[in-house]
Each structure stands twice: as C-alpha cells, then as structure tokens.
Amino acid sequence: MLNYMERSKHQQFPFHLVNPSPWPIVVSFSLLSLALSLGLTMHGYIGEMYLVNLALLVVLGSGVLWFRDIIAEATYLGDHTAAVRKGINIGFLLFVLSEVLIFSALFWSYFHSAMSPDVTLGACWPPVGITAVQPTELPLLNTIILLASGATVTYSHHALIQGNRKNSLSGLLITTWLIIIFVICQYIEYTNATFTISDGVYGSVFFAGTGLHFLHMVMLAIMLAVCYWRLRNYHLTNSHHVGYETTIIYLHVLDVIWLFLYIVFYWWGV
C-alpha cells in the first residue's frame, strides 16, 4: 500500500509500468529450444531425451521465476490496481478463446476423418486394427472426477467470497487432489491403450486432442496448488483474488472441453 501511495504522487494513471524483466525473452527461447529438441528427437536426429528434458526444465524454471515476480508485484508491491486486474482478466479471456479455437481445429480434424473414412482406413471408424478405448471405463470415471472438481472449486470460491477461509481451503485442497487423480487416471489410460500416436490418423488425432487436454490438466493442477499455497499464506482476500478466479475459469473451460472430448472421441467415435 505504501508503494501505491508513493507512486500516486508521481504517476497519474492506474496502470502498472513493468520493470525490465529477463523472463519474457528467456521463456521465448526456452520454448523455441523445447520445440526444436522435440522435433529433432521425434525424427531421429537425436537419439536421447536429454535435450528435451533440459529444455523442459528451463521452461519450467523460467516460468516459475516469472510468476514469482508477478505474485510479488501483486501481493507485496501493490502494483495490481483495479485497472491492471481488469486487463489481466481480459488477457486471460483471450487466452481461453485461443484454446477453444485450437480444440475446435482438432475436433474438425477428427470429424473430417471419422465421417467419411476412405479405403485406407477400411471404410470404417475406428479404422481396421484399432481397438478403441471403452467410454464406460476410465473415461467415464474421469468425467465424474472433473464434474466433481467443478463443484468443489465453486464451493471453495463462494466460501472465500463470504470470508470463510477454512471451508475455502478445504474445497480447494479437494479440487487439487481430484485434478491430480484425473491426471493419474489419464496416464494409466495412455499406458494401457492398444494403439499409439503413430497408428494412423485415428491415433494421431486421438492423442493430439486428449493429450493436449492432458497437458492443460497438468498445468491446472500446478495452478491450483499455487492458489492453495497463496490462500494458506493469506495472499488472497475475498475481494482480491484474480489468480484464483482465472484458475477457476480455466478449470470450467477444461471441464466443458473434456465433455465434448468424451462425447465425440470416446462415445460417438466408438
């Protein structure tokens, strides 16, 4: 608050002028190195995974340090005014829109192949030789888990707004564990699948769609864990919890995307 009061003597607008930071360029180059190492490894130019693992470690490390600075600016320096929070919300909604468009392209690809399978696929869908994952097994359990997580995170959010910190923490902890269980179940499904991403168009589009959602769920689990840590350490209040609100929106969007994945990829596609 002192920082905000001192700054108001010299700054006549509510926006946050970010100090020079190395993290945007570091994250950009680390993502570039991750993409290059993945491409080279998948095409056989690199026989080991050490470059991929190193690039992934740099991406995660630089991302953690970047978000550490953002949390410090929001919690300790008072840089996130109402105008800044509004800008963050708009930016996050645009990010959600971009994610919806990415998944729309994957659904389009799936329908393109599934609704008119040619002779190379055996003129049927799933293609000849592919044993699809049964929708009444792990996918159904994952659907129930995600719907339950949406209920528990809403309970936690309302408890936080009402100032009930204990119930908010409990709901958030349950939500975090539900998402972790979802990730574990999805991993078990992948390891027990009878086909891989290399098995034609079906394997490619199936693992592209569900795998992208899986990666987002891993990110969501990390975001929920960070929100839980911040809530325990009194970083969030009933009127100022932008990070938690955006995480909740992210969770609900992924819930809806999973419902479409379950209906199309698992149920209709079988």
Curated annotation (Swiss-Prot):
Pfam name, any one: COX3
Transmembrane region(s): 22-42, 46-66, 88-108, 128-148, 168-188, 205-225, 248-268
Record membrane topology: Multi-pass membrane protein
GO CC entries: mitochondrial inner membrane
GO biological process terms held by the UniProt record: mitochondrial electron transport, cytochrome c to oxygen
Reaction catalysed by this enzyme: 4 Fe(II)-[cytochrome c] + O2 + 8 H(+)(in) = 4 Fe(III)-[cytochrome c] + 2 H2O + 4 H(+)(out)
Keyword Magnesium: no
Keyword Transmembrane helix: yes
Record's subcellular location: Mitochondrion inner membrane
GO molecular function, one term: cytochrome-c oxidase activity
Superkingdom of origin: Eukaryota
InterPro entries per record: Cyt_c/ubiquinol_Oxase_su3, Cyt_c_oxase_su3_dom, Cyt_c_oxidase-like_su3, Cyt_c_oxidase_su3-like_sf, Cyt_c_oxidase_su3_a-hlx
EC number(s) recorded for this UniProt protein: 7.1.1.9
Record's keyword terms, sorted: Membrane, Mitochondrion, Mitochondrion inner membrane, Translocase, Transmembrane, Transmembrane helix
Subunit structure: Component of the cytochrome c oxidase (complex IV, CIV), a multisubunit enzyme composed of a catalytic core of 3 subunits and several supernumerary subunits. The complex exists as a monomer or a dimer and forms supercomplexes (SCs) in the inner mitochondrial membrane with ubiquinol-cytochrome c oxidoreductase (cytochrome b-c1 complex, complex III, CIII).
Family, as annotated: Belongs to the cytochrome c oxidase subunit 3 family.
Function: Component of the cytochrome c oxidase, the last enzyme in the mitochondrial electron transport chain which drives oxidative phosphorylation. The respiratory chain contains 3 multisubunit complexes succinate dehydrogenase (complex II, CII), ubiquinol-cytochrome c oxidoreductase (cytochrome b-c1 complex, complex III, CIII) and cytochrome c oxidase (complex IV, CIV), that cooperate to transfer electrons derived from NADH and succinate to molecular oxygen, creating an electrochemical gradient over the inner membrane that drives transmembrane transport and the ATP synthase.
Designated name of the protein: Cytochrome c oxidase subunit 3
Organism: Vanderwaltozyma polyspora (strain ATCC 22028 / DSM 70294 / BCRC 21397 / CBS 2163 / NBRC 10782 / NRRL Y-8283 / UCD 57-17)
